[in-house]
Amino acid sequence: MSIISMKQLLEAGVHFGHQTRRWNPKMAPYIFTERNGIYIIDLQKTVKKVEEAYEFVKSVVADGKEVLFVGTKKQAQEAIEEESLRSGMHFVNNRWLGGMLTNFKTIKTRINKLEQLEKMEEDGTFEVLPKKEVIKLRNEKEKLEKNLGGIKNLDASNLGAIFIVDPRKEKNAIDEAKNLGIPVVAIVDTNCDPDEIDYVIPGNDDAIRAVRLITSKIADAIIEGNQGEQLAE
């Protein structure tokens, strides 16, 4: 039973690459043909690469490690959040803050601040503070929630993999992961550099359906890996 079918990939438009003038020659092995000025991705390779990434992510989670989903472009934000939550993992879908991995200690102080503000809202502290101050604190909480809400429970030292939508956009995240020796799994379009990625999934990173389909398979791998870990206990 294959992880993903050609039919699913076709229906989601995973095969549509970028315009031929906006390409990275290193992606040539993953290109099937060119049609109307657009590169068409070889979906047989995508099927194989999804399977490789799936097995890798599954083994990472079965070893008790965590996975971070990263996709801050509009087309990816919703799928990144929903699929990471469905699989009980972590996500960044608004903005990658410098040092999110390499300087997690500093980021952790911001997370603590967010948790403190949440507690203040819950225990009624906001109700007894001056209105002006509450507005200021609520705005701060909202901003922190947007940027850090998805990594509140992340243990950066236990990160086994990072999943990326659009390596060009998420270059800072990739650099930090590389710096720490964390393997990178990514949806790589025809305009990206595959050399930076440990597990390349050639595919359209601009269509919401394409992004959701592949992201959901990564989440499935996590869920299956977790079941394996539970069985081993």
Swiss-Prot record:
Read off the Gene3D superfamilies from this record.
Glucose-6-phosphate isomerase like protein, domain 1, Helix hairpin bin
Please give the InterPro entries that the UniProt record associates with this protein: Ribosomal_uS2, Ribosomal_uS2_bac/mit/plastid, Ribosomal_uS2_CS, Ribosomal_uS2_flav_dom_sf
Q: Which organism is it from?
A: Clostridium novyi (strain NT)
Answer yes or no on keyword Ribonucleoprotein: yes
State the similarity comment. Belongs to the universal ribosomal protein uS2 family.
Spell out the protein name for this chain.
Small ribosomal subunit protein uS2
What's a single GO BP term from this record?
A: translation
GO cellular component term of the entry, any:
cytosolic small ribosomal subunit
Which NCBIfam families has this protein been placed in? rpsB_bact
